[in-house]
C-alpha cells in the first residue's frame, strides 16, 4: 500500500497526478504524503480521521503534521524541494491546523492544556513608506513551515509599531523588509531605536534594495546586538535556526561579525576614483544638436488609459523575473529544460497562467495608465518642462544627477539631461512621462486568498500583477515610441523588446540613472497621476498599489541606461541648490549614493515635510519591484 509514498530523494509529483494508491497507507503516511506533495484535497477528512485515533488534537500537530513538515524542511534545505512546493505544503498544514483549532480550544477549556509548542517567535514587517511584501510573505510561509510562530505586521509599518509589537509578542528576533532605497534609512533608524531602547534580540535585514555591505557598514554599527543580512527565503530558515539554537548561536554570531568586519574593511579601502563635479560636467555626453534628428510627438499633454485590457498585456510579459520570485534560477523559456528545476518551473508557470486567465475572465484586477509628451529643454543638469510649445513659461523641472565615477575607458560622464536639447541650442525637443498600474484590486484579491489559508495563490496574484505592470510599461513604451514618430516602423518581437533593442529609454526615479525617489513627485504632479490612475505615493515615495511603474521617456538616438553611482559633496550642494532643499535633506534621500560621510551633527530644520506626499520597486528601467 505504500508503493507511492513520498520519494524523499526528490520533488517528483508524478504520483500525485497519476495514482491514488497513496490513499491506501496509514493515516500518518497519508498526512505526510499530502504535506510533502502539497495535496490539500483530502486533508480535512484525514485530519478528522486522525482526531478519532489520537487522544488530543495537539498530538496530531506535534506528531504526523510536524513530522511531515520536518521532512519538507529537510528536503528544502538539501535542495531537493523548491520554494513553490514548500508554499503548497504550508497550505496543507494551515488547513489541517485550522480544522483542529476549534477542537483544541475545547480541549484546553476542559483540561487547562497548553497549546502546541513552537521553536520561537519571528516578527517581520515591511518598513514605513514601503509597500512591497512578496518576499516578506514568502519568508513568513517558509518559517511557519519550520514550526516558528510568525507575526507579520504587513507593509508601511512605522518603527514604534514594530518595536511595540515585538515586546507584546515577546519576539525572539525582528525581520525588516524593503524594496526602495529610502527604506534603507528607515532600517538604520529602527536599529538605532532598538539600541536606544536596550533590545537584546537579533535584527534580520532583507529585500531587493538591501545588501550585505550596506547592512555591515550602515546598519550593524548602530545596534550592538546581532544584525544579519538575509539574501533570500531559502537562507532565512538556516539563519533563524542558528540564532535560536544554543549550540549554533555563538559560532554563527562570531562568523557574522567577521563577515561584517571584512565588508567594512573592503568598503573603507575601496579605490573608486571620482572626478570633481565641475570636471564631470565639462566632460558630459555631447550631441551635435544642429544635425541630430528630433522627432515631434503626435500630441502634447497627457492621455489616460482606463481599464486597459490585461489580455493585451499578456504578450508583453517577461516571465524570467517571475521564476526569480520563486527562487527558481533560469531564463524563460529555457528554464523548462533545466534538469533540476524544469518540472517545477512548468508547474509554476501553469499556475500563473491559470490565475491570469481567472483574473482576466472575472475582471478581478484593473490596469490603468496616464502618459504624455511635453516641450522640454535641458538647463545644465536640469530638464525644463514648458507649459506649451511656445516655450514662454516653465511648468516644472526635473533635477538630474551626473556620473562622477571614472571608469576605465570612459569617454564621458552622463546625466539624463544630456539627452534633451539645451535651452540655447535653438532646437525644439520633448520629454515623455508615464505612470501605469496593474494592481487595482490585486491586494484585495491576495488578502482574500490569505483568509482562505491559500498563501500560494496570494503570492501568485501579487507576482502576476507585478509582471503585468512591467508588461504594461513595455506595451505603453512601444505605443509612445510610435506616437513620438521615431518608432513607427518597429517590428520587434517580445524577446526583442525584453532585450531593449529599440531606440529610446524609460528610466525610473529611484533607480541607477536617477536615484532620487523624490523626483516622482514632479512626475505625478505633471501627469495628475493620483487623480487619473489611483496610484499614490507613500511618505518614502513608494507607489501604491505596489504593482505600478513610472518613469520618463527619452527619444535621443544614443540614449542608454547608466548608473550615477556615488557622488561627491560638490554635486550634492549643486543639486540641493537647484531643488531648493537643504544639503542635509538631499543627503538623507541620496544616502546610498554619497561618496562621503555627511555631517549629521546639526539638526536640519529647513527640510521639506515629505508627509505631504502621502495623498498622492527591481529593474533599472522601471519601478515595478521586479
Residue ranges and their predicted role:
Residues 136-146, 151-220:
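Cofactor-cradling patches in redox/metallo enzymes
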Residues 42-46, 53-64, 77-86, 103-116, ...:
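Flexible, glycine/charged-enriched surface loops at secondary-structure junctions
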Residues 182-205, 209-210, 217, 221, ...:
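Phosphate/diphosphate-binding loops
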Residues 1-73, 234-459, 463, 484-486:
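Active-site loops and adjacent core secondary-structure elements that bind or stabilize anionic groups
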Residues 71-76, 194-216, 300-335, 567, ...:
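Amphipathic alpha-helical packing elements
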Residues 1-33, 83-125:
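Long, charged amphipathic helices and adjacent flexible linkers at domain junctions
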Residues 413-600, 615-625:
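C-terminal accessory domains/tails appended to large, multi-domain proteins
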Amino acid at each position: 500500500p505504500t508503493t507511492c509514498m513520498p520519494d524523499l530523494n526528490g520533488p517528483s509529483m508524478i504520483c500525485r497526478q497519476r495514482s491514488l494508491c497513496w490513499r491506501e497507507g496509514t493515516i500518518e503516511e497519508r498526512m505526510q504524503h499530502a504535506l510533502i506533495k502539497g495535496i490539500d484535497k483530502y486533508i480535512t477528512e484525514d485530519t478528522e480521521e486522525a482526531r478519532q485515533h489520537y487522544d488530543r488534537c495537539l498530538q496530531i500537530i506535534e506528531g504526523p503534521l510536524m513530522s511531515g513538515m520536518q521532512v519538507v524542511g529537510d528536503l528544502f534545505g538539501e535542495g531537493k524541494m523548491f520554494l513553490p512546493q514548500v508554499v503548497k505544503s504550508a497550505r496543507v498544514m494551515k488547513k489541517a491546523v485550522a480544522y483542529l483549532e476549534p477542537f483544541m480550544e475545547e480541549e484546553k477549556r476542559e483540561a487547562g492544556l497548553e497549546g502546541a509548542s513552537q521553536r520561537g517567535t519571528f516578527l517581520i514587517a515591511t518598513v514605513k513608506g514601503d509597500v512591497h511584501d512578496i518576499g516578506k510573505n514568502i519568508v513568513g510561509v517558509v518559517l511557519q513551515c519550520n514550526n516558528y510562530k510568525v507575526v507579520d505586521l504587513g507593509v508601511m509599518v512605522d518603527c514604534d509599531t514594530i518595536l511595540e509589537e515585538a515586546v507584546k509578542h515577546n519576539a525572539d528576533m525582528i525581520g525588516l523588509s524593503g524594496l526602495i532605497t529610502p527604506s534603507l534609512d528607515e532600517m538604520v533608524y529602527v536599529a538605532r531605536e532598538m539600541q536606544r531602547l536596550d533590545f537584546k534580540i537579533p535584527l534580520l535585514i532583507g529585500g531587493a534594495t538591501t545588501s550585505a555591505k550596506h547592512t555591515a557598514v550602515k546598519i550593524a554599527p548602530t545596534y550592538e546586538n546581532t544584525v544579519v543580512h538575509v539574501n533570500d527565503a531559502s537562507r532565512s530558515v538556516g539563519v533563524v535556526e542558528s540564532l535560536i539554537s544554543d549550540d549554533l548561536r555563538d559560532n554563527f554570531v562570531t562568523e557574522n561579525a567577521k563577515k561584517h568586519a571584512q565588508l567594512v574593511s573592503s568598503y573603507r579601502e575601496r579605490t573608486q576614483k571620482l572626478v570633481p563635479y565641475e570636471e564631470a560636467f565639462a566632460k558630459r555626453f555631447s550631441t551635435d544638436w544642429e544635425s541630430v534628428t528630433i522627432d515631434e510627438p503626435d500630441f502634447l499633454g497627457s492621455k489616460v488609459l482606463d481599464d486597459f485590457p490585461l489580455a493585451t498585456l499578456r504578450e508583453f510579459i517577461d516571465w524570467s523575473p517571475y521564476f526569480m520570485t520563486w527562487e527558481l534560477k533560469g531564463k524563460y523559456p529555457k528554464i523548462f529544460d533545466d534538469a533540476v528545476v524544469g518540472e517545477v518551473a512548468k508547474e509554476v508557470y501553469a499556475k500563473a497562467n491559470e490565475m491570469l486567465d481567472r483574473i482576466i475572465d472575472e475582471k478581478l484586477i484593473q490596469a490603468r495608465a496616464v502618459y504624455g509628451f511635453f516641450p522640454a529643454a535641458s538647463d545644465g543638469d536640469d530638464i525644463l518642462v514648458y507649459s506649451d510649445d511656445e516655450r514662454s513659461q516653465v511648468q516644472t523641472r526635473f533635477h538630474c544627477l551626473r556620473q562622477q565615477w571614472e571608469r576605465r575607458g570612459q569617454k564621458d560622464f552622463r546625466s539624463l539631461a544630456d539627452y534633451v536639447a539645451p535651452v540655447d541650442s535653438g532646437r525644439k525637443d520633448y520629454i515623455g512621462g508615464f505612470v501605469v498600474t496593474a494592481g487595482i484590486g490585486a491586494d484585495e484579491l491576495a488578502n482574500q486568498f490569505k483568509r482562505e489559508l491559500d498563501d500560494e495563490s496570494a503570492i501568485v496574484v501579487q507576482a502576476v500583477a507585478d509582471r503585468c505592470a512591467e508588461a504594461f510599461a513595455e506595451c505603453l513604451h512601444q505605443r509612445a515610441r510610435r506616437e513620438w514618430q521615431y518608432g513607427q516602423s518597429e517590428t520587434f518581437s517580445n524577446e526583442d523588446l525584453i532585450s531593449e533593442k529599440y531606440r529610446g529609454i524609460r528610466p525610473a526615479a529611484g533607480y541607477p540613472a536617477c536615484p532620487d525617489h523624490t523626483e516622482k513627485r514632479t512626475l505625478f504632479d505633471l501627469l495628475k497621476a493620483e487623480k487619473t490612475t489611483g496610484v499614490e505615493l507613500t511618505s518614502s515615495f513608494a507607489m501604491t498599489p505596489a504593482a505600478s511603474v513610472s518613469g520618463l521617456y527619452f527619444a535621443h538616438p544614443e540614449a542608454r541606461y547608466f548608473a550615477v553611482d556615488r557622488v561627491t559633496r560638490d554635486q550634492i550642494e549643486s543639486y540641493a541648490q537647484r531643488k531648493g532643499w537643504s544639503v542635509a535633506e538631499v543627503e538623507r534621500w541620496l544616502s546610498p549614493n554619497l561618496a562621503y560621510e555627511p555631517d549629521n551633527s546639526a539638526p536640519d530644520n529647513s527640510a521639506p515635510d515629505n508627509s505631504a506626499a502621502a495623498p498622492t520597486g527591481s529593474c533599472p528601467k522601471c519601478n515595478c519591484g521586479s
